[in-house]
């Protein structure tokens, strides 16, 4: 690879695909990780990930046809990310199981030749059904426990005679939607998540033997620097997924005010919220979240984003809240973040961040 910095980190192999650096940039929606960020990460030899959640929010006609605009934007941003990457790294997509048009997003990503589909916010039980085994696109579930990992691997093997190409193990320090109860998150310091990672690595070995292939494990949630990467690798992981740090980069697709809110954030500004998705999430405390705590914000328009959403009962419209934030209204929008956002102190470039992580 023609970058000027070297790294002792080994490459990440996902089947027949190889990322020179074992660093996946986590998918962030709405609109936070699209082609600009994902393409820049791939250009550095990592895995750039586009979030498909309401990805077409700024396409003409979105107010009337969210589904069509999102599919159009998936095509556009995968193509644009590849143009930026110039053949380096890998370009993947993150598709939430909770999305109303989950199947359509998966099929569009496959048709567009995404290198990998990473799927969470629910368990992607039918993902192998939607992704042909011999196409170029790899499939990766996000899990937060050995129980979830075993459930998916067992189900995929039994129902589809398939297994995961990659497993993302997301811990309790992650941002966005979390695969833990509020009680678990409140007592996360008592949790031995390192052991959970080891258990998942042990669990997947049965399926590696059964299918005659390696299933790399990538650790996510609270990964901030090279020390964290080395720790994950020492546990037996093959790579890491990092999201929040990539928000504070010039290439991130969010508004500059969104990025600056990350830089300005303190540890005490982070809170656990209840998302309309039905899962706990981690986000920045702001006037919007205080309004939500005092009572629901009536939903004036439905954007048809979630499979299970009762417009008359949800505490607020998650689509509107996320779009407001990514467009720069950081006081009145929802800003997901990881537990370590308070450690971010500047906006840098993807190149410099990847160099820092790679060189240590």
Locations of regions flagged by a protein language model:
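Active-site entrance/lid segments in N-terminal catalytic domains of soluble metabolic enzymes
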Residues: 1-210
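Conserved active-site-proximal phosphate/metal-binding subdomains
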Residues: 24, 174-218, 224-360
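Residue-level detector of alpha-helix initiation sites
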Residues: 32, 223-224
